[in-house]
Design a protein with these regions (language model features):
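Feature captures the catalytic ectodomains and active-site-proximal regions of enzymes
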Residues: 1-104
Length: 104
C-alpha cells in the first residue's frame, strides 16, 4: 500500500519533439490503453488519479520546442480528494494541493 505513486509518460513528450504526427498519435493511443486499464481497476471511492503535463508541444508539431498551450488538470476519484485541487489554476499549485491532501 502506497500513499503516492508518480508515473511519467515520456514517450508523448518525445513524440512532440520528434515532429512525427503518426508516431505521436500512436503514443497517445498507447497511453489511452494504460489509462483505461488504470481507471478500470482504480478505487474511485478512496483514491485519486491526477493527470497533467508541464507543457504543450504535441499540438503544434511545427516546432520542436515547448509551447505555451494551456494543459489540462484531470482528476479521477473521490470528490473529497478532488476538492483539494479546487483552487489550482496552474502547475505551481499542484504540489501544495497534493501535499495538503497527503497531510504533509
Amino acid at each position: 500500500q502506497y500513499d503516492f505513486s508518480f508515473f511519467e509518460y515520456w514517450a508523448s513528450d518525445y513524440a512532440g519533439h520528434k515532429q512525427d504526427m503518426p508516431w505521436a498519435i500512436k503514443q497517445l493511443e498507447v497511453f489511452d490503453g494504460v489509462l483505461k486499464g488504470l481507471l478500470t481497476n482504480w478505487n474511485m471511492e478512496n483514491d485519486l488519479v491526477l493527470l497533467t503535463s508541464d507543457h504543450g508541444n504535441m499540438e503544434d508539431l511545427g516546432t520542436r520546442k515547448h509551447t505555451a498551450a494551456h494543459v489540462p488538470l484531470l482528476l479521477f476519484g473521490a470528490k473529497t480528494n478532488r476538492d483539494a485541487f479546487t483552487d489550482v489554476s496552474d502547475l505551481t499549485g499542484v504540489t501544495p494541493a497534493m501535499s495538503s491532501l497527503l497531510g504533509l
